[in-house]
Amino acid sequence: MSTGTVVQVIGAVVDVEFPHDAVPQVYDALEIKSEGLVLEVQQQLGGGVVRTIAMGSSDGLRRGLEVVNSGSPITVPVGSATLGRIMNVLGEPVDEAGPIGEEDRYVIHREAPSYEDQSNTTELLETGIKVIDLVCPFAKGGKVGLFGGAGVGKTVNMMELINNIAKAHSGLSVFAGVGERTREGNDFYYEMEDSGVLDKVAMVYGQMNEPPGNRLRVALTGLTMAEKFRDEGKDVLFFVDNIYRYTLAGTEVSALLGRMPSAVGYQPTLAEEMGVLQERITSTKTGSITSVQAVYVPADDLTDPSPATTFAHLDATVVLSRNIASLGIYPAVDPLDSTSRQLDPQVVGQEHYDVANGVQTVLQRYKELKDIIAILGMDELSDEDKTTVFRARKIEKYLSQPFFVAEVFTGSPGKYVSLKDTIRGFKGILEGEFDHLPEQAFYMVGSIDEAVEKANKK
């Protein structure tokens, strides 16, 4: 193990000089023992100098400090010892519950599985959330993105998915908190503890207040832990909140390293960095990784390079809309914007496909009629269009659902709706079975039977 000295410190960027015959490789982990700080090599500048990014605060660093080369990239603990624990980007425990006691350590920079090793089976994963199961069904071993601007419910939706899937699925989960609020990480821990699934979840956090190096690598740390479970033949759920912060950390690091920015100030390597992470999130013939990723959409603009680059890697996209949230309909999923590769008659079956298509057709027609209604009023519509509008409004209301994780602030008990009940309910509305019921009866209920019961009470 060679040693070098710090020659320059500019924020999170630290330049280290090594003997010419012992220059570290790119991605090698270096350690400043006196400060307990790990650095990751990003560039070799020549003359024995390497440019690194600090995986922690660089406050108090000075020139001349001794740096030791570990000879390998950052390694993190993997395996069952990580379950129920909160770790940082280096796999160190931050939950004050003692050492991890790991059985094994993996490097965080690994190759994606080869195409031959990947699995291509399609099995649906029921979430219990009506709008998602109907219009953008998830596949086991697939990748799902939750897209939305600030404050439309990405984290709440993700928490509900974790609550529903992790409980019903009884598999293992890894949660990577990338550049999000510390409070959310704390809430998540207690949520898992209350649900009794804490011993099945490994948590890795790199919060908003941490240096860009941590936020850039914490997703890889979580993914490495998930890969270990997958390679042991288990089905793993991998949650990332928020993938946009991963991109943002890459932008910060890129600027610190002096690279020329590209469109909207993002790093020129945006597509490649996203690809490196996403290509590793895949299912093999041994086990599966089902990934759910929250994606912040800057200024609600889905064409922004960051969300646009993420779109390409996903099997299903759940788009959360501010307009729907403003109507008080939660989850604020836009059924016309959300998509899934699984919504195919050969995968979900003809009935499910026809009902989902019917719902989207009715909602699209209602959207077109809104302008006419605003100018001329409902009376100018044909009887057929009036029926479409009434059914569309019922569908809109019925797409709302009380969440288990939101019970505290809504006061309504959460509801899990099976796929069979979801299809039956929407099919009934489309066929006019419930035309006699008031639309308010469909708001914030679980199955269609509850809507009927609610209407009869009134």
Curated annotation (Swiss-Prot):
Statement: the UniProt record of this protein carries the keyword Nuclease: no
EC class: translocase
Origin: domain of life: Bacteria
Cellular component per GO, a single term: proton-transporting ATP synthase complex
Protein residues bound to ATP: 148-155
EC number: 7.1.2.2
Subcellular location per the Swiss-Prot or TrEMBL entry: Cell inner membrane
A single GO molecular function term of this UniProt record: ATP hydrolysis activity
Catalytic activity: ATP + H2O + 4 H(+)(in) = ADP + phosphate + 5 H(+)(out)
Listed Pfam families: ATP-synt_ab, ATP-synt_ab_N, ATP-synt_VA_C
Keyword check for Magnesium: no
SMART domains: AAA
Main localisation: membrane
Gene3D superfamilies (alphabetical): 2.40.10.170, Bovine Mitochondrial F1-atpase, Atp Synthase Beta Chain, Chain D, domain 3, P-loop containing nucleotide triphosphate hydrolases
Family: Belongs to the ATPase alpha/beta chains family.
PANTHER family assigned: ATP SYNTHASE, ATP SYNTHASE SUBUNIT BETA, MITOCHONDRIAL
General function of this protein: Produces ATP from ADP in the presence of a proton gradient across the membrane. The catalytic sites are hosted primarily by the beta subunits.
Protein name: ATP synthase subunit beta
Organism encoding this protein: Shewanella pealeana (strain ATCC 700345 / ANG-SQ1)
Gene symbol of the encoding locus: atpD
